[in-house]
Amino acid sequence: MAVKERIGTVVSDKMEKTVVVAVESRFPHPIYQKTVSRTTRYKAHDEDNTCRVGDRVRITETRPMSRQKRWAIAEVLSHSPKAAAEEANKAEAQEVKQ
């Protein structure tokens, strides 16, 4: 059986070691043939708390880790520019304090 993978965007990182990833799927409507986009939200395990809101990530299906969490972060494809700027500002603030 193949390992299921999805690519999506982190929309929430407020939980400890867990992020919510939104995956958008597009398909034609069966009757009207208009392209419909549907967003599915997955709770994914983030062991090191490295993901931030806006990051593009690849998630893979794994064993159940809790009642709703059955996916894990495989890799961070790209960091959001906002999160990268915030981390740079934090680093500068720490340098100024020292």
UniProtKB/Swiss-Prot annotation:
SUPFAM superfamilies named among the record's database cross-references: Nucleic acid-binding proteins (SSF50249)
Coiled coil: none
One Pfam family hit: Ribosomal_S17
Entry keyword rRNA-binding: yes
Record GO biological process: translation
Gene Ontology CC: one annotated term: cytosolic small ribosomal subunit
InterPro entries tied to this protein: NA-bd_OB-fold, Ribosomal_uS17, Ribosomal_uS17_bact/chlr
One GO molecular-function entry: rRNA binding
Keyword Ligase among UniProt keywords: no
UniProt keyword terms in alphabetical order: Ribonucleoprotein, Ribosomal protein, RNA-binding, rRNA-binding
CDD domains per the UniProt record, alphabetical: Ribosomal_uS17 (cd00364)
Quaternary structure (record): Part of the 30S ribosomal subunit.
Family: Belongs to the universal ribosomal protein uS17 family.
Function, in words: One of the primary rRNA binding proteins, it binds specifically to the 5'-end of 16S ribosomal RNA.
Protein name: Small ribosomal subunit protein uS17
Species of the source: Synechococcus sp. (strain CC9605)
Gene that this polypeptide is encoded by: rpsQ
